[in-house]
Amino acid sequence: MKLVVCFPGIGYHCDKPLLYYSRKLAACAGYDHTLLLQYTYHKDGLRGSPAALREAFDTLYAQAEAQLSAADCPQYDDVLFLSKSIGTAVSAAFAQRHGIPCRQILYTPLSLTFAFAPQNVLAFLGTADPWSDAFSVAAAARANGTPLFLYENANHSLETGDVLHDLATLQDVMQKTQTFIADTPH
């Protein structure tokens, strides 16, 4: 049995392109069980405030913990975490704290994500992401041994405003995602 878990961001739910298409690719690769997490968080002022971001992380982590309590990850032969934004920190923390041997795909990770030393990871980030300092995240990814693909002038949704360019970026991200998913785990 194979499980895929989607960890959304606060404003980026599981039916938005990065998580939607990566989840479909996982299903095509034989992931027969899917869990889509949902969060509730309504406070403003997260950007530029490490304390507020940490508070949001703690709240979302507790919600994820509650939703994953019945998942019984060890029963699965292969576990894949797909995550976006603050969800990348939640997924990395959950894997670390529970010792789950999973693979993770991090879409637009935050610097906080790498505090949990995610393993078996692939990451994607835009250089114009207002939520992540691309230089800091790239340095943290490098120190963690995480392959990170950077997209020039792309924002937190990996978009630039040029629709055709954005579609090409999405296709590139999904091709890399598909290759990572298809690789033999662990």
Regions found by a protein language model. Give the residues of each.
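Conserved alpha/beta-hydrolase "acid-adjacent" motif
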Residues: 15, 115, 130-136
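A conserved short beta-strand
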Residues: 99-111, 120
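Short, proline-enriched alpha-helix->beta-strand connector loops that line the catalytic pocket
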Residues: 2, 102, 116-121, 144-146
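Catalytic histidine-centered segment of alpha/beta-hydrolase-like enzymes
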Residues: 154-169
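Serine-hydrolase catalytic machinery in alpha/beta-hydrolase-like enzymes
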Residues: 2-75
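Gly/Ala-rich beta-loop-alpha elbow adjacent to hydrolase catalytic centers
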Residues: 82-92
